[in-house]
Amino acid sequence: MAGNSIGQLFKVSTFGESHGVALGGVVDGTPAGLEITEADLQIDLDRRKPGQSRYTTQRREDDQIKILSGVFEGKTTGTSIGLLIENTDQRSKDYGKIKDVFRPGHGDYTYWHKYGLRDYRGGGRSSARETAIRVAAGSIAKKYLKQFHGIEIKACLSQLGPIKADVFDWNEVENNLFFFPDVSKLEALDEYMRGLKKQGDSVGAKVKVVASNVPVGLGEPVFDRLDAELAHSLMSINAVKGVEIGDGFDVIEQKGSEHRDELTPNGFTSNHAGGVLAGISTGQDIIASIALKPTSSITIPGNSINTENEAVEMITKGRHDPCVGIRAVPIAEAMMAITLMDHLLRQRGQNPHVHHEHGPIPGSV
């Protein structure tokens, strides 16, 4: 099965299914000498893991990471880093009745037609459970980027259903179970989600991810432009149906005089482009947003077909997230980190000699 790896010089490959024995991955390209422990990776995994609130799936997985290789005496060796997370709370019996039925809005129908068979237990390979290894790999990239280059990556839930953040207080993001930056909306979020659970329905969300202190020059025009690669990596996250860089689709209503990010000796005057021009980082904050669809795993009856092309009524059972966007926050950070790490190594490999007398201007005035 192709499509299990991302990156060139910093390459992440994953394997495993939702109800399989374990999830695993291999991370290639990490420079030697980075101090890393399982506890370092566990921090982000704990932010992502299921069962932490009544608004995420109640599947209980500890997501305990094991480093199998590539680390010796607490430091990376420069060789492949092997990662493993055992699955401990599978309830495959929840899915026995749908082994011949296609859940609408899921990959059951497409996987079956592509491969001639499918793992119906929790979605198999198409389950968002696969992203646990991405988060672990992203933690390696995040630590390297911050320690050696001062690059910091953060994300938040900026919208859940109709409720939007009007204030972005990043200090509050880790203080609530929604990863929401506007504390004035927390009560409304709680009330909305309680109503949603009573209805047996789900809702979509928007996640914002920001990378700060990114150097000028990352990105490989024309097909590996940094924004194109970010869109690729973020779009690969389960349930993502849209990616915006900078102002995104708001640029439709902007005029050129408004949108252009003017330059001064003291820095850029704005950042409508989201930190990328012509596919190359500008040194400003890189800003991206992703739109996640509402999960189709809901208890409201719906229409579908089975493998015999017969009409059936579908009611999804099992343990599911009423809003997948909540746990997507650390996943978005991980994919941003993996992409920036790869392009940082690529720039260092191709253009280490490029230096300008005056250096880059600040990211903002």
From Swiss-Prot:
Pfam family, one: Chorismate_synt
Entry keywords, A to Z: Amino-acid biosynthesis, Aromatic amino acid biosynthesis, FAD, Flavoprotein, FMN, Lyase, NADP
Keyword Amino-acid biosynthesis: yes
Entry GO terms, CC: cytosol
InterPro entries to which the protein is assigned, alphabetical: Chorismate_synth (IPR000453), Chorismate_synth_AroC_sf (IPR035904), Chorismate_synthase_CS (IPR020541)
Residue numbers binding NADP(+): 48, 54
Pathway: Metabolic intermediate biosynthesis; chorismate biosynthesis; chorismate from D-erythrose 4-phosphate and phosphoenolpyruvate: step 7/7
Sequence similarity: Belongs to the chorismate synthase family.
Protein name: Chorismate synthase
Species of provenance: Pseudoalteromonas translucida (strain TAC 125)
Gene name as annotated: aroC
